[in-house]
Regions:
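A short acidic/basic microdomain associated with nuclease active sites
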Residues: 49
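Soluble "head" domains of membrane/secretory-pathway proteins
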Residues: 1-21, 40, 45-46, 54, ...
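Hydrophobic membrane-insertion alpha-helices, especially the h-region
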Residues: 24-40
Length: 189
């Protein structure tokens, strides 16, 4: 019995290496989990411009769900982070206005969409509170598997109306913006 107890005591002895491993292991696991979450589940961004005022302010830090469109398609009015079609090294944040197969036209600042069923609707603009939209643009026929984007601050937004490559492919959408976490926490609608 004494030999068994001595062996058990020796196994439980702390060594400097074991202390370091015991200390570092939870930190390493936490870092790996954080990286996996950032890479596979969430995307975050700092908004550098006023193109989405007043929905998203300059300097706001936002979080998007990378999983939002795995089983569902993006919907009109979703605010998304996506790869800018004219330079995919940059991420942009805009609102989805036109869906695949639709035609988008802006007349006197009002956005009209001709849906795939041929019905033309005037889009709601209750989120466009920062300015009075002006101008005529389009018509733009949205290709299959692509989307037409506009900023909420319509008079100060570099969006689908002005890009060389007017549309964002679904696979280039990084995620659906779900909330702002700085400087205040609030849901993005």
């Amino acid at each position: 019995p004494r030999k068994a107890n001595a062996a058990a005591d020796k196994a439980e002895e702390k060594t400097p290496v074991k202390d370091i491993v015991d200390f570092m292991l939870p930190i390493v696991i936490a870092v790996i989990l954080a990286l996996l979450l950032k890479t596979l589940v969430f995307a975050n961004a700092v908004v550098p411009s006023g193109s989405m005022l007043s929905t998203i302010e300059i300097g706001d830090r936002i979080v998007a769900s990378r999983l939002a469109y795995i089983t569902n398609d993006p919907q009109r009015y979703d605010v998304v982070i996506f790869k800018y079609p004219d330079d995919e090294r940059q991420n942009y944040v805009k609102r989805i206005i036109g869906l695949p197969g639709e035609t988008v036209e802006i007349k006197d600042g009002t956005v009209y969409v001709t849906q795939t069923n041929g019905k033309t609707i005037q889009l709601r603009d209750d989120f466009v509170t920062y300015c009075t939209p002006v101008g005529d643009y389009g018509p733009y026929k949205v290709p299959e598997d692509s989307y037409f984007m506009m900023g909420d601050n319509r008079n100060d937004s570099e969006d689908s109306r002005f890009w060389d490559h007017k549309f964002v492919k679904k696979k280039k959408i990084v995620g659906k913006v779900v909330f702002c976490y700085y400087p205040s926490i609030h849901k993005i609608k």
